[in-house]
Amino acid sequence: MKTGALTTFLALCLPVTVFATTLRLSNEVDLLVLDGKKVSSSLLRGAESIELENGPHQLVFRVEKTIRLPGNEERLYISPPLVISFDTQLISQVNFQLPRLENEREASHFNAAPRLALLDGDAMPIPVKLDILAITSTAKVVDYEIETERYNKSAKRASLPQFATMMADDSTLLSDVSELDTVPPQSQTLTEQRLKYWFRLADPQTRHHFLQWAEKQPPS
């Protein structure tokens, strides 16, 4: 897709519905999957927030933070993938509140029994269900979307089965075809629909930065 066409395409992707919940992102949280869909890290890189509709949501993420080691050394701590489900029906803002993670002991405790909170815009706790996402694949590169689908079908603590059935074959993404869409090959269709989805969720500043980046890319 040429850059100019990509920019026009993304501009037309601006949401026509009004989102009611702002999820504030944290630089210590690596978001992997949202509501059964793999997160587009390139589009959301540097984003401060994403917009969500009211209702149930599920995040798969890792906590990443530099911790201290003996001898004044440091290392990057990366938690196991976590699943958290919550409902934003009456909530306008969601914020992460992470526990203290400064050293190996605290990191080990978090690995064994992770705990964190989601707070609303008034700093009040939001009811959540939190669990560790057990990885079943032995592949070097983990497909977190597939792992999340398996988790949601297994009736675990933070499972939301509706996201497993909706996202199993990208049927939701592919069904949202307007008169502006052509009928490209399947792989291109998936790429464009996923890009459209994440562009809709990104905050205005992130959209602007992404469009600026797209304008600078050479034609394919």
From Swiss-Prot:
Q: Does the keyword Ribonucleoprotein apply?
A: no
Q: Which UniProt keywords apply?
A: Signal
**Which gene is this protein's source?**
yccT
Task: Detail the disulphide connectivity of this chain as listed in its UniProt entry.
Answer: none
PANTHER family per record? UPF0319 PROTEIN YCCT
- What is the recorded name of this protein? UPF0319 protein YccT
Species of origin? Salmonella newport (strain SL254)
Q: Which family does it belong to?
A: Belongs to the UPF0319 family.
Q: Where is the signal peptide?
A: 1-20
Among the Pfam families in the record, one is DUF2057
In terms of superkingdom, the source organism counts as Bacteria
